[in-house]
């Protein structure tokens, strides 16, 4: 397993936004949300808008960190407080609720 499988977003937000200031928080969030949704033509995703699916991550920019390494890749990131997938609360105060709100999302290139 590659370490970024466990801490890719946290690495961007912790190391490159907060610590090294290589990218702004606003630009990083756009690159993690709106940009890929737009590029993949995913309807009603990637933005906080009325009528869009409620895919929301609440994190603390001061504490978000990744810990995964090549030697020990299966280390969860910290600083993510809440996650809602399609409006379903799946992470509550950093703990999985047991709920699964995800579903298969078809992009424009999907063929049966």
Regions found by a protein language model. Give the residues of each.
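His/Asp/Glu-enriched, well-ordered alpha-helical/loop segment
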Residues: 1-63
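Short, solvent-exposed cationic patches
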Residues: 105-112
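Short C-terminal domain-edge/linker segments immediately following a structured domain
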Residues: 21-26, 86-93, 112
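C-terminal cap of metal-dependent C-N hydrolases
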Residues: 58-103
């Amino acid at each position: 397993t590659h370490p970024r499988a466990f801490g890719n977003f946290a690495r961007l937000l912790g190391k490159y936004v907060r610590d090294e200031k290589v990218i702004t928080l606003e630009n990083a969030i756009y690159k993690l949300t709106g940009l890929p949704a737009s590029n993949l033509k995913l309807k009603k995703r990637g933005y906080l808008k009325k009528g869009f699916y409620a895919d929301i991550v609440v994190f603390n920019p001061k504490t978000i960190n990744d810990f995964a390494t090549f030697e020990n890749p299966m280390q969860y990131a910290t600083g993510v407080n809440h996650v809602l997938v399609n409006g379903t609360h799946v992470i509550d105060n950093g703990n999985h609720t047991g709920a699964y709100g995800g579903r298969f999302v078809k992009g424009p290139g999907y063929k049966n």
